[in-house]
């Protein structure tokens, strides 16, 4: 039996499981812990991310790595959030899911789960990663690119950290993050995502539309998705620029990002 500490501090016992013998001649020993309240991934928010981060923190000294099973709809968002919440990480945290459930005859769940366990159990990759369709991606570089295809995720501006073949897992060690200092692992769970909005610029958008978003009650930040290298329509008499300038003067933080998948 293995012990797992809940966020509340309660210690619970769980069966100790093992994978089949891997290509490396070893088994990965693991235990399964399930949250008391299961959540559809499309409904996750900062509270759910905090619960995951706190669970990793409570059990950090008990395990050599962590595999987190997660629905695919918001999987890339959770990976990105955890990569900033889990600070000074010194162990692998691998998130995965599936496009088809394990009970289906044709599914990707088994390969994704076993592949994640092999990565977390054999390789010291101290990052929050996403494992899917035999590829290991840096968590905060991934995005979902397919609604039903097994190759559901990609990282357009970052090569995979590892690729699994029928023989072994090939790690691109030059890409793996290596800590430059020995700091104690900690978590940051003080998130305020509820007061940040995203707005995608499109041809013909009116400054009044942008202004309406920027005047939402309690808004503190806006991620503005613009054309190309950061371009947006200025509007008649620079109306769009005036709307953005007014919001900045009111203390709203505006971040300009490109809509393009690839950039320098």
Sequence positions of predicted segments:
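ATP/NTP phosphate-donor binding region
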Residues: 1-58, 262
């Amino acid at each position: 039996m293995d012990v797992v500490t809940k966020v509340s501090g309660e210690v619970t016992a769980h069966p100790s499981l093992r994978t089949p013998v891997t290509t490396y001649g070893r088994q990965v020993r693991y235990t399964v812990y399930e949250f008391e309240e299961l959540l559809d991934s499309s409904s996750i928010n900062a509270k759910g991310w905090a619960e995951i981060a706190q669970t990793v923190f409570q059990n950090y000294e008990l395990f050599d790595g962590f595999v987190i099973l997660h629905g695919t709809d918001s999987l890339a968002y959770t990976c990105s959030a955890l990569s900033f919440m889990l600070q000074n990480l010194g162990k692998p945290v691998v998130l995965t899911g599936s496009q088809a459930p394990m009970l289906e005859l044709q599914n990707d769940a088994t390969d994704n789960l076993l592949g994640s366990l092999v990565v977390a159990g054999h390789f010291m990759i101290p990052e929050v990663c996403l494992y899917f369709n035999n590829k290991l991606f840096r968590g905060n570089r991934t995005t979902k690119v397919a609604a039903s295809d097994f190759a559901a995720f990609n990282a357009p501006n970052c090569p995979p950290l590892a690729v699994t073949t029928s023989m072994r897992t090939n790690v691109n060690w030059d890409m793996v993050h290596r800590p430059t200092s020995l700091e104690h692992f900690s978590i940051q769970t003080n998130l305020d995502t509820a007061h940040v909005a995203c707005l995608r610029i499109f041809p013909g958008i009116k400054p009044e539309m942008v202004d309406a978003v920027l005047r939402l009650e309690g808004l503190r930040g806006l991620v503005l998705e613009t054309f190309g290298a950061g371009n947006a329509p200025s509007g008649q008499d620079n109306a769009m620029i005036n709307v953005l300038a007014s919001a900045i003067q009111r203390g709203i933080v505006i971040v300009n990002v490109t809509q393009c998948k690839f950039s320098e």
